[in-house]
Amino acid sequence: MLKSTLAAVAAVFALSALSPAALAAKGDPHVLLTTSAGNIELELNSQKAPVSVKNFVDYVNSGFYNNTTFHRVIPGFMIQGGGFNEQMQQKKPNPPIKNEADNGLRNTRGTIAMARTADKDSATSQFFINVADNAFLDHGQRDFGYAVFGKVVKGMDVADKISQVPTHDVGPYQNVPTKPVVILSAKVLP
């Protein structure tokens, strides 16, 4: 009886170590995007956006974002990346995740959010960095909204620089940089 009770207590402690609260207690993860335009450091909010943060970190740890591009850039709005290579070939993402846009985080300048289609729960690998306050993307403004899951803590000048590069259309894609802006690597910082 004592052995089974001790085993149950140990299991509860082990499972609690994986909870969002336990992750937050360790400190929110920081991710470094090394790009052809400079470095951008992100701080992710695992307490308010645990699904989006886990999804993003899983892509980072798998190397998925390495050698992808910021394939859509719009001055005064945002820079979007995480899905295409330099030839505008889309990488195969993991299944979509739940939209966490109702988490209270807002699409303000310097935040990072999940990109998606018209289907509210369609976000996979693509993300965008807001280079302006974009309240119309927040939960309930016009639809469910776009889930913010972190913010830029270093390198906002790099994001601003990327947002100003010349763009053109490539096939069906608009606002594509004429010279690719490449995410050379993405890594979780210790």
Curated annotation (Swiss-Prot):
For this record, the Gene Ontology CC terms, alphabetical, are: periplasmic space
Molecular functions (GO terms): peptidyl-prolyl cis-trans isomerase activity
In Gene Ontology terms, what is a biological process of this protein? protein folding
Pfam families to which the protein is assigned, alphabetical:
Pro_isomerase
Q: Which reaction does it catalyse?
A: [protein]-peptidylproline (omega=180) = [protein]-peptidylproline (omega=0)
Extent of the signal sequence: 1-24
Query: For this protein, what is the EC number?
Result: 5.2.1.8
Q: Where does the PPIase cyclophilin-type domain start and stop, copy by copy?
A: 27-188
Annotated compartments: Periplasm
* Top-level taxon: Bacteria
Q: Keywords of this protein's UniProt record, alphabetized? A: Isomerase, Periplasm, Rotamase, Signal
SUPFAM superfamilies given in the database record: Cyclophilin-like (SSF50891)
Q: Which PANTHER family match?
A: PEPTIDYL-PROLYL CIS-TRANS ISOMERASE CYP38, CHLOROPLASTIC (PTHR43246)
Family, per entry: Belongs to the cyclophilin-type PPIase family.
What does this protein do, in the record's words?
PPIases accelerate the folding of proteins. It catalyzes the cis-trans isomerization of proline imidic peptide bonds in oligopeptides.
What is this protein's record name?
Peptidyl-prolyl cis-trans isomerase A
Which species is this UniProt entry from? Salmonella typhimurium (strain LT2 / SGSC1412 / ATCC 700720)
The top of its lineage is: Bacteria, Pseudomonadati, Pseudomonadota, Gammaproteobacteria, Enterobacterales
